[in-house]
């Protein structure tokens, strides 16, 4: 695979495009016979965690490459903002090294990057070039973003291709660039089309003959006719790198598209959309009677704050488009640590000033921020190394023509340093966000005293959210799903529970299969129909989960439990305070559970309270609220309670809480024995670190993975649990450990725990990644006989331990 690039800037592979989300880039040095240690070239080794390290490493490579003239190998991810050199990946090099290497050599790159001067040759744009590809052809498709249809087309093209062509694929680095397919033998262009016409990318599934293939669809003739182009790679591992280049191009293209959207809004005089630019600045007391703007990191643009120093927050609001709206005043400025903050958690700042700017074009609000106040403790403690925290600031603006105050809310990243810290290198660039406000005529009061119409806010959207919509396949804007910003990708912030949207779209063929199966099932509710397990393993369609989950749990005839629930919610519970505390921390990232005393929290409270009264032995235990919340997202609270009780009793979840968690510890023992058998190297590494299963898997078992993982993954796990039983937890746990093995083998004790807590859940925000994980989990063998054997071993071990303990403890164990 030869790869050449005229320029590119390394970025993380988006989750929705590439499956190699565990890749991370670190620099390693390799000694050669001709070079000393100090002249050795850095190389690029692929793993997973940080653009900063990558860019610094790449800059070092570019500097060193000017001194060294050896032949080189290359990876598509080059990095240099101003560099016009290119890199080539040859077939040479040591075949026994698993790591990918990148060495840029001027003697070869200048030739490969040089633009063609021959009129007979196509002009090379700023592109990444991929050789050793075979073009299997193209065909028309009716659903350009349908993965099953794309995979079928890929399989058909792979099996029926009679005369595949060796081609070079050009993927542009610029938003106005074009994807080009060139015949290698004749250098003739086979096809060319702008990058924005590419709608969807897909790779062949592992374990199939198409595992070395990839394909993309493009709109060839307007919006009603689409083509899919299919390729195979001589080097299978190159598929992910090709998709990486596409994802980078999509990012740039979508950015340009969002600019076009903004231009359209700006130039539509009759539009009901009003555009605002809102900027944020934080100032600190400089000790000389003045307040100076705090510095921002040059690369990531996070604010650098100092501990204990009085601050001022300055927000500037400027209208950019449409008829000018009259801002009367700022109703309030609010601030809080964190992001996705509930309204009740925002704190009002004292206002120092508000009014129009000196040029009259903007409205400026200044608030006084005392960082020593208890509610701002998180923003006044020194931030640990390599970690940042979020801060949310909002202003409520009173606009003459709008009925209610308009809230502009900004979320940014900060780091807190000691009060005596000095900053040498920083950026003065302003933190700015663009908002699009859509108004509609008010049905109440129709005009102001001046005769202007009165409006209501129909929607208020940030530009960053618009860009995510442009990238979302469900919105028709592009080939990759919504991405968290780079700061979130690299931060140490844990993923909020309840994160992620789950699409209700489902191919007609799958819905037909489920419809036929449900028809048979309703004819005989006592017996599960044939083919059920196969369909469930692929995931129950979101639109059908309420019905299917109740059928799987056996809640089709549960009038007695429904009546009992209505009585239980009227009874008092001794655990009401604990329940109230927990529901505020359950799925804060989900709109349904965000608001204090909202419908979501109210229903969740009633289910947890009812169960605490119903189950007198166990009552309510911390973590149960997450499972109840998952059920509430699919069905009314009465039905959710019935399914919840079934899972606790019939599926045995409540057993994990009994007898001082004895059964839970047995599960940990079984998991470690399975690791010892299936992942011996990881088991040995954990043993060396004294890292035990209870340290990372407690939440997996007690909450059924519902507490920290994205909803697309959580819902699929509940599908499998209700169909296959509690043992599915072992399947999912082993799949997580297998897919993360390389990262965990390199981690120390603290690093491994942090990986389980922070990085691991973030990997499955994309539905495709979660689907692949569930597919792997279903393929893992966990024999019931083996689990029974491990359970007996655990009982024997516990009996031996108790022989050494107090006789009363031993008696209690025997009575379990």
From Swiss-Prot:
* Cell inner membrane as UniProt keyword: no
Give residue numbers for the site Arginine finger.
581
Region feature (Disordered): 29-125, 466-502
Q: Which UniProt keywords apply?
A: Endocytosis, Endosome, Golgi apparatus, GTPase activation, Protein transport, Transport
Query: What spans are recorded as compositionally biased (Polar residues)?
Result: 81-100
Q: What is its main location?
A: other
Q: What does this protein do?
A: GTP-hydrolysis activating protein (GAP) for small GTPase RAB22A, converting active RAB22A-GTP to the inactive form RAB22A-GDP. Plays a role in endocytosis and intracellular protein transport. Recruited by ANK2 to phosphatidylinositol 3-phosphate (PI3P)-positive early endosomes, where it inactivates RAB22A, and promotes polarized trafficking to the leading edge of the migrating cells. Part of the ANK2/RABGAP1L complex which is required for the polarized recycling of fibronectin receptor ITGA5 ITGB1 to the plasma membrane that enables continuous directional cell migration.
Q: Which GO terms describe its molecular function?
A: GTPase activator activity; small GTPase binding
Q: What is the protein name stated in its UniProt record? A: Rab GTPase-activating protein 1-like
Q: Where is the composition biased (Low complexity)?
A: 110-121
Site, as annotated: Glutamine finger? 622
What is any one GO biological process for this UniProt entry? protein transport
The UniProt entry, under InterPro entries, shows: Kinesin-like (IPR022164), PH-like_dom_sf (IPR011993), PTB/PI_dom (IPR006020), Rab-GAP-TBC_dom (IPR000195), Rab-GAP_TBC_sf (IPR035969), Rab_GAP_TBC_domain (IPR050302)
Domain (Rab-GAP TBC): give its ranges. Answer: 539-725
| Subunit annotation | Interacts with ANK2.
């Amino acid at each position: 695979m030869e790869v050449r690039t005229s320029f590119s800037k390394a970025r993380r592979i988006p989750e929705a495009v590439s499956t190699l989300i565990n890749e991370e880039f670190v620099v390693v040095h390799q000694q050669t016979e001709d070079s000393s240690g100090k002249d050795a070239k850095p190389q690029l080794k692929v793993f997973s965690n940080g653009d900063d390290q990558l860019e610094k490493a790449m800059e070092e490579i570019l500097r060193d490459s000017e001194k060294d003239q050896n032949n080189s190998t290359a990876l598509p991810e080059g990095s240099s903002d101003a560099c016009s050199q290119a890199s080539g990946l040859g077939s040479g090099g040591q075949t026994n090294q698993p790591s990918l290497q990148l060495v840029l050599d001027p003697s070869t790159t200048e030739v490969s990057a040089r633009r063609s001067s021959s009129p007979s040759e196509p002009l090379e744009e700023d592109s990444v070039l991929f050789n050793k590809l075979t073009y299997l052809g193209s065909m028309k498709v009716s659903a350009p973003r349908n993965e099953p249809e794309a995979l079928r087309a890929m399989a058909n093209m792979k099996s029926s291709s009679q005369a595949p062509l060796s081609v070079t694929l050009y993927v542009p680095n610029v938003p106005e660039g074009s994807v080009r397919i060139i015949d290698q033998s004749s250098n003739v262009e086979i096809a060319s089309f702008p990058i924005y016409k590419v709608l969807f990318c897909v790779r062949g599934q592992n374990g199939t003959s198409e595992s070395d293939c990839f394909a993309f669809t493009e709109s060839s003739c307007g919006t009603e006719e689409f083509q899919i182009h299919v390729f195979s790679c001589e080097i299978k591992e190159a598929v992910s790198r090709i998709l990486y280049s596409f994802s980078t191009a999509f990012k740039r293209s979508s950015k340009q598209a969002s600019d076009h959207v903004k231009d359209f809004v700006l130039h539509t005089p009759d539009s009901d959309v009003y555009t605002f630019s809102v900027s944020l600045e934080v100032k600190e007391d400089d000790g000389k009677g003045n307040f100076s703007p705090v510095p921002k990191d040059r690369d990531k643009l996070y604010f650098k704050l100092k501990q204990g120093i009085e601050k001022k927050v300055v927000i500037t609001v400027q209208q950019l488009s449409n008829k000018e709206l009259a801002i009367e005043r700022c109703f309030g400025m609010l601030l809080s640590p964190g992001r996705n903050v509930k309204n009740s958690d925002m704190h009002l700042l004292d206002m120092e000033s508000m009014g129009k700017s000196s040029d009259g074009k903007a409205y400026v609000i200044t608030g006084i921020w005392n960082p020593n106040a208890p509610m701002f403790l998180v923003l006044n403690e020194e931030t640990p190394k390599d970690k940042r925290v979020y801060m949310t600031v909002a202003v409520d603006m009173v606009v003459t023509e709008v009925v209610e105050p308009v809230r502009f809310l900004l979320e940014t990243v900060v780091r807190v340093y000691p009060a005596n810290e000095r900053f040498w290198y920083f950026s003065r660039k302003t933190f700015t966000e663009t908002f699009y406000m859509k108004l509609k005529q008010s049905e109440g009061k129709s005009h102001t005293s001046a005769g202007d119409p009165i409006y209501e806010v129909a929607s208020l959207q940030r530009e960053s959210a618009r860009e995510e919509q442009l990238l979302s396949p469900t919105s028709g804007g592009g080939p990759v799903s919504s991405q968290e910003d780079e700061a979130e990708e690299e931060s140490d912030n844990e993923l909020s529970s309840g994160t992620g949207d789950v699409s209700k779209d489902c191919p007609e063929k799958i819905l037909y299969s489920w419809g036929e199966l449900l028809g048979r099932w309703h004819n005989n509710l006592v017996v599960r129909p044939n083919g059920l397990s196969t369909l469930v393993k692929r995931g129950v369609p979101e639109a059908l989960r309420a019905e299917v989950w109740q059928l799987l749990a056996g809640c089709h005839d549960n009038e007695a439990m429904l009546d009992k629930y209505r009585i239980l919610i009227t009874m008092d519970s001794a655990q009401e305070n604990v329940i109230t505390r927990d529901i505020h921390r359950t799925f804060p990232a989900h709109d349904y559970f965000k608001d204090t005393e909202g419908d979501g929290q109210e229903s969740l409270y009633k289910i947890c309270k009812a169960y605490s009264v119903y189950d007198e032995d166990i009552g309510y235990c911390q973590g149960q609220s997450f499972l109840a919340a998952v059920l509430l997202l699919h069905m009314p609270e009465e039905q959710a309670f019935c399914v919840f009780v079934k899972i606790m009793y019939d599926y045995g979840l409540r057993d994990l809480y009994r007898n001082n968690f004895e059964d839970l510890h047995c599960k940990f023992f079984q998991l470690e024995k399975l690791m010892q058998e299936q992942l011996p190297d990881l088991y040995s590494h954990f043993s060396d670190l004294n890292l035990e299963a209870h340290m990372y898997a407690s939440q997996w078992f007690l909450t059924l993975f519902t507490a920290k993982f994205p909803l697309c993954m959580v819902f699929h796990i509940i599908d499998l649990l209700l169909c296959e039983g509690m043992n599915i937890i072992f399947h999912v746990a082993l799949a997580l450990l297998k897919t993360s093995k390389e990262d965990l083998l390199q981690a120390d004790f603290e690093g491994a725990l942090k990986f389980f807590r922070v990085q691991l859940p973030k990997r499955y925000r994309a539905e495709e990644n979660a689907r692949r994980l569930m597919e792997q989990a279903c393929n893992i063998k966990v024999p019931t006989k083996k689990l029974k054997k491990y359970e007996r071993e655990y009982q024997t071990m516990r009996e031996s331990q108790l022989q050494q303990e107090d006789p009363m403890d031993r008696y209690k164990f025997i009575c379990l």
